[in-house]
Amino acid sequence: MLARSLKKYFPVLSISFCILAFTIFLPLKEVFPLTRTAEGIVSEVTDGDTIKLETKEGTKLKIRLYGLDAPESPKFNRKTGRINKPGQAFGKEAGDVLVSKILGKKVKVDVLGIDRYDRMVSIVWLGDRNINLEMVREGMAEAYKEYLRAPLRAQFLEAETEARISKRGIWSLSEYQRPSEFRKSQKIRG
């Protein structure tokens, strides 16, 4: 009876296994079939994980860096210039590091999806440098485990482990609060 059931489902199981194997070993665009690429100049760095990109056509795109969650930077009242929501340790530094890497520079983004705030969730490339991974490796952000998918998941987790062991950036703190937990405690949207 079991052998008959296995024979019946063998083609389905075989195809499922092949799909899984291809998913693990295919390039990014094959794994994320909706991946689109855009190029432009980084016109603004909002914080350690969000930028604005202006394409050569003049289109302005809001980009959320995929795979990382940077500490929250302070939020300022535009009229008064005063802080109306506090930031986290390394929040400002994470933004400053991202500014030094890409502000005013031409980058390519691989858009993997759209988040609930209508930002394009993307991998940001400066030449052959994966800026997202660099931010995690330097301890300026944690790997955003809740949203990581194969095949990139392993790279981001490895980069975070390297930063933790070396006590870089956020991992040098004696007490660290995840940005997602901080946002909940401060009622800040992500």
In which residue ranges do the predicted regions lie?
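N-terminal Lys/Arg-rich, disordered targeting/topogenic segments
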Residues: 1-10
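Hydrophobic membrane-insertion alpha-helices, especially the h-region
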Residues: 11-24
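N-terminal targeting pre-sequences for secretion and organelle import
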Residues: 147-190
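Short, surface-exposed, charged/polar-biased interaction segments
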Residues: 27, 63, 86, 119, ...
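Electropositive
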Residues: 28-146
